[in-house]
Amino acid sequence: MGPVMPASKKAESSGISVSSGLSQRYRGSGFSKALQEDDDLDFPLPDIRLEEGAMEDEELTNLNWLHESKNLLKSFGESVLRSVSPVQDLDDDTPPSPAHSDMPYDARQNPNCKPPYSFSCLIFMAIEDSPTKRLPVKDIYNWILEHFPYFANAPTGWKNSVRHNLSLNKCFKKVDKERSQSIGKGSLWCIDPEYRQNLIQALKKTPYHPPPTPQAYQSTSGPPIWPGSTFFKRNGALLQVSPGVIQNGARVLSRGLFPGVRPLPITPIGMTAAIRNSITSCRMRTESEPPCGSPVVSGDPKEDHNYSSAKSSTARSTSPTSDSISSSSSSADDHYEFATKGSQEGSEGSFQSHESHSEPEEEDRKPSPKEGKDALGDSGYASQHKKRQHFAKARKVPSDTLPLKKRRTEKPPESDDEEMKEAAGSLLHLAGIRSCLNNITNRTAKGQKEQKETAKN
């Protein structure tokens, strides 16, 4: 790290502002007017004027201060030492470190220095400097070479970058050349008025002094843009702290952006409590009997991390006296299969007697000798699905409770037979009418044929 010039000895005219420096070079042009629109600029831009003749350089500063200081280490203050440390305090409003003093870009003093402008900004400045506000590609090359000598010895790839920016960037558009103009091959390029302001803002935000070391990104030069953000403004440029940098002993948190989001630590105790809460809510839903498919709304923030499916909302908790625990995904089909097996093992009368029980008998749960043989009564399944069976009875016919074979062999009731007979009779009646109509049409067709044949003869 080289010697540092104190801020008190620093020259006042370290650079020129956008509205003053560039406007002197492009006096009376639209480019200078565009840059003078905003007066809130707090950073200078380089002086890119290249005038002929000898000129006294006013940018150089007297170096007598360097000889006055015997011990250079004493000139390093606390702010300089803190700029080296990776652990920073972004809330400290300390001034910028003099270690990274803002030296203006001067093409005359250091022609081999790369200009800190993007190619879109270079194209924008070249087009805005032209009187007609439109230039061909070769004139853009000439303008860049004239004002930035760095590109004279630079690799030829920068011309490809200029062409790519012209063709791919929406800020530039191709215009037709006039007949009076003789520009040779190529097209004219101009600035799209819709995106002109974007280019001006990009030019104003361009850092005119690139950081010499990566420490510039970690130096404390001002508070963050918003609380908890990783961006901070330094020397008029928006910089970002590296994600790996630890600040104040912890990584950067964006609580300022998302005030409602807060980290919830998940511990084994919390997971156990969540499981207990879910079991309790399941039992409460069993007692209150909510409608099927209704969403579960909880005001407890601990229960926000629990989820309930449509199947679990219809589940019922097993009674303590039952031998087996039924899963939440049990449906009416499982009940029918279970009933079929019970009827095959026992007698048909036992199952029908179980279906014919009244509600008081089901509530009292007094097992009869026939119920003792029933598998539903033994497993406690009936006590678990009382209300489901009650609703199923209203929409079931007696034949639904029988096995599949007996449903096929069972005769339909008399009312169904009468309806089927009436339907068959109506169909036969319609078929008879249609056959009669067909016979009549056939007879008429034959008669007409015979008449035609006799007429021909």
Curated annotation (Swiss-Prot):
GO molecular function term, any single one: DNA-binding transcription factor activity
GO cellular component: nucleus
Keyword Transferase: no
Bias kind Basic and acidic residues: ranges: 354-376
Biased composition (Basic residues): 384-396
Organism: Mus musculus
The UniProt record lists the keyword Repressor: yes
Name the record gives this protein: Forkhead box protein N3
Main location: nucleus
Compartment(s): Nucleus
Gene3D superfamilies membership: Winged helix-like DNA-binding domain superfamily/Winged helix DNA-binding domain
SUPFAM superfamilies, sorted: Winged helix' DNA-binding domain (SSF46785)
Described function: Acts as a transcriptional repressor. May be involved in DNA damage-inducible cell cycle arrests (checkpoints).
Pfam families membership: Forkhead (PF00250)
Gene name for this UniProt entry: Foxn3
Region (Disordered): 1-24, 86-109, 285-422
Matching InterPro entries: FH_FOXN3, Fork_head_dom, FOXN2/3-like, TF_fork_head_CS_1, TF_fork_head_CS_2, WH-like_DNA-bd_sf, WH_DNA-bd_sf
PANTHER family, per database record: FORKHEAD BOX PROTEIN N3, FORKHEAD BOX PROTEIN N3-LIKE PROTEIN-RELATED
